[in-house]
Amino acid sequence: MAKTYSWSTDAEEVRRLFTLTFDDLHFLEPLRADAQRLYRALVLVWARVERTLVSDPSSIPEEVITHVSRQLSLKPSVLSQLRNHPSARSATFEAVRKHLDVRGWQEADAEQLSAYLIEKVSHTGNPSALFDAATDWMVRVGVLRREARDDH
């Protein structure tokens, strides 16, 4: 079963959400290895849209990988050369968090988000609207989603 997202994988939506900014391109420029540059770009755009850091780029939709690789004048196949060691992955995650000015989820965030959503529940019972409200809160606070990762 294909994963569903809150956005469409049609070309226009992918372009709108996953286009690298000038600052993003400048951030990626120092990376000499094509595979690492594409991986870091994917982690960056995915964190911006989905609010999570992705360890395995194959979990990202092909349309997104293709769009981002074109912006870097690379072929998606360069990812086959990626040697994503834990230390390199951690460095990528830290660099992306710093570039986006966000931080990882902390236990205290659960209580704050819960209080925020309780206030919203009185206005809507729509799960989709509550999900959007939670995402808006995370963007405003500058926090990424809590995630289960094997690289702690």
Q: Model-found features: residue ranges?
A:
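Long amphipathic alpha-helical coiled-coil/heptad-repeat bundle
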Residues: 1-152
